[in-house]
Amino acid sequence: MVGFSGDTIAAIATAIVPQQGSVGIVRLSGAAATEIARQIFQIAGQQPWESHRILYGYIRDPESGRLVDEALLLPMLAPRSYTREDVVELHCHGGLMPVQQTLQLCIRAGARLAEPGEFTLRAFLNGRLDLSQAESIADLISAQSPQAAQAALGSLQGKLGHPIRQLRDRCLDILAEVEARIDFEDDLPPLDLEAIAAQLTAAGADMQAILSTADRGELLRTGLKIAIVGRPNVGKSSLLNAWSRCDRAIVTDLPGTTRDLVESQLIVGGIPVQVLDTAGIRETSDQVEQIGVERSRRAAQSADLVLLTIDASAGWSAEDQTIWEAVSDRPILLVINKRDRLSEAERHAIALPQQEFKAIVWTAAAQQQGIEDLEAAILAAVGTGDLTSANWDWALNQRQVAALTTAQTALRRVEETLQAQLPLDFWTIDLREAIAALGSITGEEIAESMLDLIFSRFCIGK
């Protein structure tokens, strides 16, 4: 896909919900975008065709003259467009038929169906965006919380790319100084080793400052997966319902009511959280319940955090111990539910387990009590605290973290080379590695295969 030949591409740019969408957009980009649009769009009246001016009219099949839709057209001529090419958007009525037929007319008129992410790839290749900005567009589209959206917007505005380019320029300056001494050793004064050591230390510290945001950024981007586990009838489903503030799971006094995983999507302290209410774990002869129990075990093993829930009035039982042993390799937070059934004195007297937990939280889910304490304990357990009040300029992805780590490691080797007073040729190897790694974040140095992989993760039409 990389290295496009200048052809014109087309794709549906909006999500299509059959019979429900109000507006659907078909987007064209390329040298022939306006010519193709003129073939299929009939302007109503005497409206002038001008860039960035919306036109009203009709989409028609140019061969048969058949009316396809009443629509709006928005031309955005190069370079003042998303891709820095001529871009035309056709705003149709939503639903499948109008946009699909409009897209087919565009292709018949000479456009090619765009590949996933190809519009953004063209924006990158044409210098409209750097690679970190391009990746942030996918993050913005998939953001599950206001904080994740804020981080994506910060990166889109260049708040990640700018410091990365500054770091790369500093490394390039050091490399230029070193190579000048290699090529013109007799004509230049010796390197100021103390100054270079200070520059390397400062650059490494700046890289570490960016890397220190990686864990929180990953939580913003991908979220947490939390499994609520426990024996039957301890209030797991009530806990999910109270937490979700709606009836997501059926609640009865009968053990084994929940037989399958029940999922809820929540935001906790700015972090997207997928909560799974699992079937009560116990020995059972019921084949359907056995399947649910096995799914509960698998859900717990794949969770980032397990909420082991017990009944306050029953205390810690042998069954609870067995369940703990099954999930003990995961981070566990103990939830003591139904606290309202005990007096204050009884709560203090209850025998708590000796195992180490991330935290112990008392709740009364049926009365919606203890949920705030639970959320605070979760944020403490993952080590983030509440992220809603923080200003997020970016959220590093795994590729960016790996590149920064590579650059940081390479600079440390340069420092070691300096301290060991090795020949200057040794410096250049590691400096070039750091420069290449930093350049891969913003796209100055990136393999075509990596570009294809990055943009293949985008949706078609973006």
From Swiss-Prot:
UniProt-recorded Gene Ontology molecular function terms: GTP binding; GTPase activity; metal ion binding
GO CC, any one term: cytosol
E.C. number(s) listed in UniProt: 3.6.-.-
Subcellular location: Cytoplasm
Entry-linked Gene3D superfamilies: P-loop containing nucleotide triphosphate hydrolases (3.40.50.300), Probable tRNA modification gtpase trme, domain 1 (3.30.1360.120), tRNA modification GTPase MnmE domain 2 (1.20.120.430)
Keywords: Cytoplasm, GTP-binding, Hydrolase, Magnesium, Metal-binding, Nucleotide-binding, Potassium, tRNA processing
GO biological process: tRNA methylation; tRNA wobble uridine modification
Cofactor notes: Binds 1 potassium ion per subunit.
Domain TrmE-type G: 223-383
PROSITE patterns, per database record: G_TRME
Binding site for Mg(2+): S237, T258
Organism superkingdom: Bacteria
EC supergroup of this enzyme: hydrolase
Cystine pairings recorded for this chain: none
Quaternary structure annotation from Swiss-Prot or TrEMBL: Homodimer. Heterotetramer of two MnmE and two MnmG subunits.
Family: Belongs to the TRAFAC class TrmE-Era-EngA-EngB-Septin-like GTPase superfamily. TrmE GTPase family.
Protein name, UniProt field: tRNA modification GTPase MnmE
